[in-house]
């Protein structure tokens, strides 16, 4: 992958670089006239088609043969070996192969003449041979059908953790073999490479895909992919193979190429991934802008690479970088290997041999295809007989050179600045003659010059030769003499310009000749290629019209000043860079490489009539009969003149009108720039008063709250989704409890989701805290604005002058408008913050229980009151079960959960009832009786208290009948002036009830009911821990509407809670105070009689165990009946 940054500024002097058609980058030494794959400064390859491994020394790479054997390439010594250069061991992948080292691992002449039929990553390198003769040196005796792919786990490129990540996320990837199932993988796009992992922890890379050699696009119907939001990554070589072969699928897989299919979850994710991956795939073309990746990809025949003829060894090709700086082999990207099995790959072994080889070569393409295919890159050896080079301005060759050398398809020619003006004049005449003869040739004119003096029109009978000593590009693949042209291509592209060229390629020569616009368009392309090749906007190339060439050379050869330059459209113009001084360049090198951003990312720029050669220029192609505004190619450097072809075939008046229109367009552009410069530099005052400042800050805080609300809402949605999925996994865990394999998979998924859930909850809590802080600040600002409003209203009332009142009124209106606009969101913010502070459902008590006041500050704290841990509000069933639970709770003199609170009289409306029948919290154990009451009697021994557990069946039946009758008679609704007893008190406590009821300030207010709980009095002189632990804390709940008369009544002893527990009375009816007291009195009498009856029997049973004591009999606390 990209181990070094490519760029003109990063290269030393006399160095340049070239880009192969498949995206590989090599470097050219203009002094030694040789090529290398290694960057001259870093000593590492940038993109040579092989893998860079971290465990290899500098200048080493790993390659793979067609059979799948791994070998190592030393670009420093230009050798290959199967052994690791550091460990000296064979790769574990080669265990199934029989490897045989050759004594001379360098490439031989015979090897360079033969082209392997398939190779890794669409490259022809020294290490990717498929035959015994064309291998990197070591022989592979065992042949195998194993196909290497970068996406495999073992051959994956190691990811550099220091490179920032562009995009990461989940995608579905289709398997390359088997049933081609879709698997969900975690993908990371970094360092122009797509890595994928099993999960988001990114622990072990499953595979990697180097994107610069791929094109990413949505799936097509022929892909037979029915999955939604699917897209694919197709290798550039695969694309040409698909368009040229009907059986490209299997052949592509067999030749080492592969198409990757991906699927996103949403359309937005798919668009984002396709955009990011395409940008990574085109990074080389964007960084250099010397060759547009889109155009390189569109070319239907292999584009020749930079190839240098080395003086020491007389060889050409980027193979120098793999084998040696002075020896190498052809490294040609062949996109049509399936159709060209018999073609031969030749290299220049010596000047004479090279001439003989090139004289035999023939071009299978028509002249129009020649121009269309070799427009952007100065291609390989396609020229006339070599002649001594002469220095010409801008790299233009004298007229004696064949036009094929000047139209961008000739060999590389070194050029130097001119010294005399006659040379410039000769250049103009030469170019003019070339244009005319080329136009005649396109129209089939028999009066054209001899074949070797025309523009690029090379037929089968034309002889080809090279300049003698220095070639920039290797030979492109050619058909044998007499071979037919390849079928038309239709390569997709993002630019309309590419579509025009693709449709142009589909046309036959006759159609092209018949289409008059096609001729003009080809002439325009040739002109632009000439100017691009020679790298200067001031190279005067005056073109004649095809219509004028038939009438002679003397008509209307307009030479328009080069400064008149009309861009095609503002969106196609890259912004001009700052002026820089560049060292002497190669003639065909563009003056500047400018990154062209997509249209949606460009900013509008103004292009002036600057004379800088680095300004991008556009042009609208027109003729007399058809006006077609074509899109120009996005190139780092393009020179478009107003002269050619938009002025062809027009009279003087038409030409004047055309030039006037162009100048008006430029005037408009200049007007915008002048207005920009003449803008007033008057400072801007945002706020006029402190009211403006305060309101702006207030609105800013509202925006902060909105952003936080959006984040919290998104996090909550993610949390809910994760929790729902985890709930399903929990059910699956229970369902597949007997299947360990399923359990392991489910547990692994559950672990990952739980980690994500923890992360989301932590983020949600953090955002909620920020939301709460922002809300507090919002309330503070709101209060400040309200105070400011009141102040302004007061000033408005006291203001005397009309102007002052008007200004204050404006400020008041501003405040009113802002507050009215913000009021819509305020309620949402408040609900969100309150949901965090006070959630609706409180399953676990997050706060202490409601506090209980004491009788006085001098009294000691009451003993603890145990409570069920499940809910702070006790249900009626829990109240009945509570005495049984109290037996096992030890005594604590200072309970931590009880605190003193404000008296209910001070805040009588704080308690908000929700359910009328819910019982209030149970009060703590009482300590003292009121002074006027008699002290209670000593409770009975534990063995007597347990007799109630052995009540006879007849006694229990009698109690049950009485309770049933009471329920039938007591179904009445309490009024506000009636007393409702929620629990039961003993007889000594009833004696003091009248005094307690007169003191409502000592009561408890339930949190969700309107009842006041009056705590009963405990034992004043009790010292026994057993007695205290076994004493039940009775309490009475009264309506707040109690009057003094009803509170002074003397109540009989009610039935204890323990008796109610054994009686099974689970439905309590609402009874009046009189009915309830009467019922309790009857029960008390029945209990006393029953106790006396069974007293003797209880002494004989002998079960005195305090551990089983639930509570003392309430009747024994003071039997007054």
UniProtKB/Swiss-Prot annotation:
GO BP of this protein: cell-cell adhesion mediated by cadherin; epithelial cell-cell adhesion; pore complex assembly; zonula adherens maintenance
One GO cellular component term: nucleoplasm
Domain WW: 9-42, 54-87
Source superkingdom: Eukaryota
Composition bias, Pro residues: 567-582, 861-871, 933-942
Modification type Phosphoserine: residues: 536, 545, 569, 604, 608, 612, 858, 860, 867, 871, 903, 907, 986
InterPro entries: PH-like_dom_sf, PH_domain, PKHA4-7_PH, WW_dom, WW_dom_sf
Modified residue annotations for Phosphothreonine: 870
PH domain boundaries: 164-282
Biased composition (Basic and acidic residues): 308-356, 437-446, 497-514, 589-605, 958-969
Biased composition (Polar residues): 115-131, 460-475
Location in the cell: Cell junction, Adherens junction; Cytoplasm; Cytoplasm, Cytoskeleton, Microtubule organizing center, Centrosome
Coiled-coil regions listed: 700-801, 1067-1094
Region described as Disordered: 105-137, 299-514, 547-632, 841-876, 888-971, 1003-1028, 1082-1121
Subunit structure: Interacts with CAMSAP3 and CTNND1. Interacts (via WW domains) with TSPAN33 (via cytoplasmic domain) and with PDZD11; the interaction with TSPAN33 is dependent on PDZD11 being bound to PLEKHA7 and facilitates the docking of ADAM10 to zonula adherens through interaction of TSPAN33 with ADAM10.
Chain's role: Required for zonula adherens biogenesis and maintenance. Acts via its interaction with CAMSAP3, which anchors microtubules at their minus-ends to zonula adherens, leading to the recruitment of KIFC3 kinesin to the junctional site. Mediates docking of ADAM10 to zonula adherens through a PDZD11-dependent interaction with the ADAM10-binding protein TSPAN33.
Protein name: Pleckstrin homology domain-containing family A member 7
